[in-house]
A protein has these predicted regions:
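Glycine-rich phosphate/oxyanion-binding loops and their immediately adjacent helices
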Residues: 4-11
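Nucleotide/phosphate-binding catalytic cleft detector across ATP-hydrolyzing
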Residues: 12-174, 182-240, 247
Length: 249
């Protein structure tokens, strides 16, 4: 019910479509990457959820893509981390600074004079404490109002599905930290589950395989690149024309 009330404040019907109403900014605060949607402009920013900082001075060195390139390649005093784990905040202070940076980058420095309304999506079945942490971090980053939306609902709206119709729509949203599954009807999830197995676990599996099979130690960034390159199954499918037999290499 709380989530549905939040949706009512954020979205409205316009010519049979669901559109963002009162929120100025929509944020997909993902474990692996963050997307920022600005009303009237669409998705204006997509960058990795990575922050590099100097642990001697606690000063932020880089955020986003620049920080991702530092993963596994920094001197001892520079640490590149992901401040979110399995879809929830693991480092509140770093997440707050990261959010502030991305909001400012997406809409410009002038947003401090007109604080935006922001909707943020979170995994299904997160606790109230975890939701509150996201809400507080977003307010601290400069939001005037914050609405929390579950990721499958946000994915359904993004796909153009009318979530208020009296029919079931099954949504599977595989992210970096969680895989969220929900059946949505009449404005909200009827049943949902959040599995803490997703893209980051695939990366770790690649690292373990390379170490076990080839006695080769690779880093997180290389593992992600391998995952992306081998992640498309289309090139691995062969169809025999006479028999229509499907063979997967």
């Amino acid at each position: 019910p709380e989530m549905s009330r939040g949706l009512g404040d954020v979205y409205k019907r316009q010519e049979g479509r669901l559109v963002m109403a009162s929120a100025d900014i929509g944020i997909d605060l993902g474990t692996a990457s963050i997307l920022v949607y600005v009303k009237g402009k669409g998705v204006v920013l997509k960058e990795p959820s990575v922050v590099a900082y100097d642990r001697d001075t606690n000063k932020i060195v880089a955020i986003g893509e620049e920080a991702r390139l530092m993963l596994g390649r920094t001197p001892g005093n520079i640490v590149a981390i992901r401040p979110l784990r399995q879809g929830v905040i693991s480092d509140y202070t770093i997440t707050e600074k990261m959010l502030k940076y991305f909001i400012q980058k997406a809409v410009g420095r002038s947003y401090f004079g007109r604080r935006p309304r922001i909707s943020v999506c979170v995994p299904s079945q997160v606790t109230e404490v975890e939701k509150k942490a996201v809400e507080d971090a977003t307010y601290a980053a400069g939001a005037r109002d914050v609405s929390i939306i579950e990721e499958p609902v946000a994915a359904a709206i993004g796909a153009g599905i009318d979530i208020y119709r009296p029919c079931g729509n099954m949504i599977v949203d595989i992210g970096g930290g969680t895989a969220d599954i929900a059946v949505i009807s009449l404005g909200g999830p009827v049943v949902s589950a959040s599995i803490k197995v997703a893209g980051d676990d695939f990366d770790e599996a690649v690292v373990r395989f390379m170490r076990k099979k080839h006695n080769l130690l690779i880093g997180e960034r290389t593992a992600e690149e391998i995952k992306i390159k081998i992640g498309t199954c289309l090139s691995l499918i062969h169809i025999s024309e006479p028999t229509r037999h499907l063979r997967i290499s």
